[in-house]
């Protein structure tokens, strides 16, 4: 009942706004296509809830996740920026901070010979936009962490004329 009456009220509101917008647009001679798009976006913005739920205190979620407590409480994580891929010249993947967990016990699977582990978090890598976000997430979950600072490469000064200098070993004679 409430959903039906809400949609009727929303529909009436949109028709009223459209009538007002059509009256305003007929004077300024703007195409009606932009009117429909803007009215639809306005209706979308009204229906979406932009409230965020924040929890200030640390909650114990070990019973909800199903992960054993020894895997959650005694973790050590590494926070770092990944190195640039040597196969490409771009630096797009070096903008985010990554968090990966320490390696726990592993063993060789006797059937297939694969490396096995009982740790559900060992292969998980989390991505953060800033180092502070990663540190606060680790502190919120009670994990100890190591931070590897971003390595900024020093640019080497090169000149085109150095390729043709006679006192360097850049030219190889054939004799």
Swiss-Prot record:
Segment annotated as transit peptide: 1-42
Gene Ontology MF term list: NADH dehydrogenase (ubiquinone) activity
Function, in words: Accessory subunit of the mitochondrial membrane respiratory chain NADH dehydrogenase (Complex I), that is believed not to be involved in catalysis. Complex I functions in the transfer of electrons from NADH to the respiratory chain. The immediate electron acceptor for the enzyme is believed to be ubiquinone.
Stretches for region Disordered: 151-175
Keyword rRNA processing: no
InterPro entries: NADH_UbQ_FeS_4_mit-like, NDUFS4-like_sf
Assigned protein family: Belongs to the complex I NDUFS4 subunit family.
One Pfam family recorded for the sequence: NDUS4
Biological process annotations from GO: aerobic respiration; brain development; mitochondrial electron transport, NADH to ubiquinone; mitochondrial respiratory chain complex I assembly; proton motive force-driven mitochondrial ATP synthesis; reactive oxygen species metabolic process; regulation of protein phosphorylation; response to cAMP
Residue numbers carrying Phosphoserine: 173
GO CC, one annotated term: mitochondrion
Protein name: NADH dehydrogenase [ubiquinone] iron-sulfur protein 4, mitochondrial
Gene: NDUFS4
Membrane topology: Peripheral membrane protein
Gene source species: Homo sapiens
Localization, UniProt: Mitochondrion inner membrane
Record's disease association: Mitochondrial complex I deficiency, nuclear type 1: A form of mitochondrial complex I deficiency, the most common biochemical signature of mitochondrial disorders, a group of highly heterogeneous conditions characterized by defective oxidative phosphorylation, which collectively affects 1 in 5-10000 live births. Clinical disorders have variable severity, ranging from lethal neonatal disease to adult-onset neurodegenerative disorders.
């Amino acid at each position: 009942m409430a959903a039906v009456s809400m949609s009727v009220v929303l529909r009436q509101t949109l028709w009223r706004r459209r009538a007002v917008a059509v009256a305003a647009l007929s004077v300024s001679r703007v195409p009606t296509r932009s009117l429909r798009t803007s009215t639809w976006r306005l209706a979308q913005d009204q229906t979406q809830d932009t409230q965020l739920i924040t929890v200030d205190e640390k909650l114990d979620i070990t019973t909800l996740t199903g992960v054993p407590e020894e895997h959650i409480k005694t973790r050590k994580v590494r926070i770092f920026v990944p190195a640039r891929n040597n196969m490409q010249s771009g630096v797009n993947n070096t903008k985010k901070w990554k968090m990966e967990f320490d390696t726990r016990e592993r063993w060789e699977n006797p059937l297939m010979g694969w490396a096995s582990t009982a740790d559900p978090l060992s292969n998980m890598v989390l991505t953060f936009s800033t180092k502070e976000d990663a540190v606060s997430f680790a502190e919120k979950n009670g994990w100890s962490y190591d931070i590897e600072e971003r390595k900024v490469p020093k640019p080497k000064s090169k000149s085109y004329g150095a390729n043709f200098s006679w006192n360097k070993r850049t030219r190889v004679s054939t004799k």
